[in-house]
């Protein structure tokens, strides 16, 4: 995981509703600290923490539940640079290098974005097409790449 730029190791989740595979609706949430920015749950991997442990911890912290099952894992780490307007806020990092997982909410799991440190102020379960219409610009290429991969593999 060596990189020339200083990328923050990060895990991201594409969360499918519990009705998957009968209906393919994907969780997307609006960030509370930015204007109309919608994204998937994601967060940093702590030193010494496994990627999967970080996945479950971040889901619990951001959406109030870690009651998910892993459907698939994107085979590569993907990186992106922070846009200039937020790079100072994220110092010393230039961007993030991410591992993506496709997960399904377990039946009976409840989303709660009103967590101890809320990162989101709204969420929806939407179609793949709607995801592409809602996502913010600097992550769009990665979202398209990951979703297309999971589509090509027959998961969504």
Swiss-Prot record:
Residues 6-148 form the Nudix hydrolase domain. The keyword Hydrolase applies. Pfam families: NUDIX. It comes from Campylobacter jejuni subsp. jejuni serotype O:2 (strain ATCC 700819 / NCTC 11168). The lineage of its organism: Bacteria, Pseudomonadati, Campylobacterota, Epsilonproteobacteria, Campylobacterales. Keywords: Hydrolase. The keyword Hydrolase applies. Belongs to the Nudix hydrolase family. RppH subfamily. This is RNA pyrophosphohydrolase. HAMAP family: Nudix_RppH. Its EC number is 3.6.1.-. Signal peptide: none annotated. SUPFAM superfamilies: Nudix. Accelerates the degradation of transcripts by removing pyrophosphate from the 5'-end of triphosphorylated RNA, leading to a more labile monophosphorylated state that can stimulate subsequent ribonuclease cleavage.
């Amino acid at each position: 995981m060596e990189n020339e730029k200083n990328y923050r190791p990060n895990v991201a989740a594409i969360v499918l509703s519990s009705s998957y595979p009968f209906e393919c609706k994907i969780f997307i949430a609006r960030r509370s600290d930015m204007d109309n920015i919608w994204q998937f749950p994601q967060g940093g991997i702590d030193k010494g923490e496994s990627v999967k442990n970080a996945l479950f911890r971040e889901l619990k912290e951001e959406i109030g539940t870690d009651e998910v099952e892993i459907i698939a894992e994107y085979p590569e780490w993907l990186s992106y640079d922070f846009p200039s307007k937020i790079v100072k806020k994220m110092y010393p990092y230039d961007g993030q290098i991410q591992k993506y997982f496709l997960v399904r909410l377990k039946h009976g799991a409840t989303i709660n974005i009103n967590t101890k440190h809320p990162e989101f102020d709204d969420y929806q379960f939407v179609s793949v097409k709607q995801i592409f219409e809602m996502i913010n610009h600097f992550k769009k290429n990665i979202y398209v790449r990951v979703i297309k991969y999971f589509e090509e593999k027959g998961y969504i």
